């Protein structure tokens, strides 16, 4: 080979934005991208939360900054792209990690507004953000979109029905992005995490029965950590995954095998 494979993982000169990056999976992915050379913009609804993350990343030698955006507000989703470009001159990598799930229980107990909120944050926001970014990415020779879905999008969870529906939609959206934008050099892939130890999923892993069942079913019998997803996200964001688009990558310890 005429190229060192390590060079394909190098993200130096790339600009990345990670939504839902104030903690958990988003924060871990932002750190991973930064450690491989990317300039990282961390975003969430509350500016002070991601400012703290950006400060920690900068203290580690990573080029990072913070921007606030509510992914359930389409104007804010689009404005986030504009702000990143204004600040850094371009955008190459998008990680759509922001998500919401305000209900835990049967679909019958959820009203229309709850479903609309879930779909807005988990599906429509990522779409509008990416649509805004396409011309920017195209002008820079392409880019990479990594959508954080869920194994619930592949095998719906009974008590997380509407959330599972939204993640199924995000997986399908990822494939449409890959088909429509591949000719412009823009790749799109989805990561489907299993049970990860984050604040977002604490209602599950703090439930002794749920945790015991998950650990018994998974070949890798431990709960996942946010850092377990960072390497996969870096791979998909980098040229090491240059031939990967429309893919659905499961990281669940083998739970769904």
Q: Can you name each region flagged by the protein language model?
A:
Residues 15, 22-23:
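Conserved glycine-rich cofactor-binding loop
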């Amino acid at each position: 080979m005429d190229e060192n494979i390590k060079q394909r993982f190098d993200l130096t000169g790339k600009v990345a934005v990670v939504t839902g990056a104030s903690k958990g999976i988003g924060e871990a992915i932002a750190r991973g991208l930064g450690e491989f050379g990317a300039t990282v913009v961390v975003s969430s609804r509350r500016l002070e939360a991601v400012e703290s993350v950006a400060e920690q990343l900068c203290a580690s030698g990573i080029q990072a900054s913070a921007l606030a955006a509510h992914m359930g507000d389409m104007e804010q989703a689009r404005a986030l792209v504009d702000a990143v470009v204004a600040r850094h001159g371009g955008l190459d990598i998008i990680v759509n990690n922001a998500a919401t799930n305000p209900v835990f229980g049967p679909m019958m107990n959820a009203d229309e507004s709850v479903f609309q909120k879930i779909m807005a944050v988990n599906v429509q926001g990522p779409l509008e953000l990416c649509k805004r970014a396409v011309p920017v990415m195209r002008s820079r020779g392409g880019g990479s979109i990594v959508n954080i879905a869920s194994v619930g999008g592949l095998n719906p969870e009974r008590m997380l029905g509407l959330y599972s529906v939204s993640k199924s939609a995000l997986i399908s959206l990822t494939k449409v992005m890959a088909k429509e934008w591949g000719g412009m050099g823009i790749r799109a892939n989805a990561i489907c995490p299993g049970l990860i130890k984050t604040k977002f999923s604490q209602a599950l892993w703090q439930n002794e029965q749920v945790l015991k069942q998950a650990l018994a079913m998974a070949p890798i019998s431990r709960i996942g950590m946010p850092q377990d997803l960072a390497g996969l996200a870096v791979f998909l964001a980098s040229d090491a995954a240059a031939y990967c688009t429309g893919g659905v990558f499961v990281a669940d310890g083998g739970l769904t095998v």
